């Protein structure tokens, strides 16, 4: 059995649900009270996949301009990005559009796996950002698009498993390390709506 750490950054505007998604993934519970962070925070969880052990680290940044320089350093060593926005606040999708620029200039490679995550899918009746607009943004930047709810737990674990498989395919197979995925796995694409 081999062991690998996968570092996934989870940027998003304050209040978009990044902390709730991270906690739902790591602890499988929803925490109502939001706390302010200083700098950067992460959660981790061990996942067994194809007779190998992966530690998935979800890193989220403080939503404070003073710490942007610190946060951007973490982009260089990341394997992927879950860019989170809430459809209930238009400014959160604008934040993602700006964040794309930082990712492209600070990530170690342009081939990092990037997903656009619509959080709070349980609040769709309060939409300010249509599903069609979100899908258009994801296509414009070459991101895969997913919806989830940290409150209900809908799709949170599935999204992390999908990005894990995509990272393995992009990074490990690019190093000719074919033992992680079979042909069947390569044909199994994640699509969650």
State each model region's role:
Residues 182-193:
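Polybasic, Ser/Thr-rich amphipathic helices
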Residues 1-175, 193:
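TRAFAC-class small GTPase G-domain
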Residues 177-181:
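Activation on terminal intrinsically disordered regulatory regions flanking enzyme cores
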């Amino acid at each position: 059995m081999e062991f690998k750490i996968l570092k996934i950054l989870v940027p998003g505007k304050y209040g978009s649900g990044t902390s709730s998604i991270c906690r739902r993934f790591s602890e499988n519970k929803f925490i109502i009270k939001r706390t302010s962070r200083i700098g950067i925070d992460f959660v981790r969880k061990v996942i067994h996949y194809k007779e190998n052990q992966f530690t998935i680290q979800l890193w989220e940044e403080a939503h404070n301009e003073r710490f942007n320089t610190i946060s951007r350093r973490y982009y260089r060593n990341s394997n992927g990005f879950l860019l989170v926005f809430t459809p209930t606040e238009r400014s959160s999708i604008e934040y993602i559009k700006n964040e794309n620029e930082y990712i492209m200039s600070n990530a170690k490679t342009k081939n990092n796996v990037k997903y656009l995550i619509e959080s709070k899918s349980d609040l769709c009746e309060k939409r300010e950002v249509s599903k069609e607009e979100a899908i258009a943004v994801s296509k414009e930047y070459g991101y895969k698009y997913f919806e989830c709810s940290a409150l209900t737990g809908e799709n949170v674990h599935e999204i992390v498993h999908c990005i894990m498989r995509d990272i393995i395919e992009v990074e490990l197979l690019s190093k000719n390390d074919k033992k992680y995925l079979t042909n069947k796995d390569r044909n199994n694409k994640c699509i969650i709506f």
